[in-house]
């Protein structure tokens, strides 16, 4: 898979470069999720959902909001989750850069900074809010 070519397609459709990169990162994560054992245990939330419903470029978002159902949010579990997504034979790997705790008024979660890298070493930085 060539991430740069996918970015170029979205850019030609009118997305700004950073939004095109974010969209490709989201597409990769969603594809990997849909083909993983976690597909029935994760809810996609936030701007990704709104953008896909409205198809409005104004709704484009940089991060991906996920809600894990009956899955631990400790760092080892998050590393295992990403490791499982990386088992797909798509020549795209997700590398965790950093994990930080999130404390919101109604819940605690994690922000996972990741780098999505293709076989040509083209990469996109994004983050997952879990």
Question: Which stretches of residues belong to each language-model region?
Answer:
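Compositionally biased terminal segments of proteins
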Residues: 1-130
């Amino acid at each position: 898979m060539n991430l740069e070519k996918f970015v170029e397609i979205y850019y030609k459709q009118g997305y700004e470069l950073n939004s095109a990169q974010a969209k490709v990162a989201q597409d990769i994560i969603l594809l990997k999720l849909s083909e993983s054992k976690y597909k029935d245990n994760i809810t996609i939330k936030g701007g990704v959902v709104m953008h896909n419903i409205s198809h409005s470029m104004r709704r484009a978002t940089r991060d991906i909001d996920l809600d894990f159902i009956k899955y631990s949010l400790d760092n080892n579990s998050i590393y295992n989750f990403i490791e499982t997504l990386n088992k797909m034979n798509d020549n795209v790997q997700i590398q965790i850069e950093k994990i930080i705790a999130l404390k919101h008024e109604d819940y605690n979660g994690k922000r996972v900074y990741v780098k999505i890298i293709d076989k040509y070493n083209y990469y996109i930085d994004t983050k997952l809010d879990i």
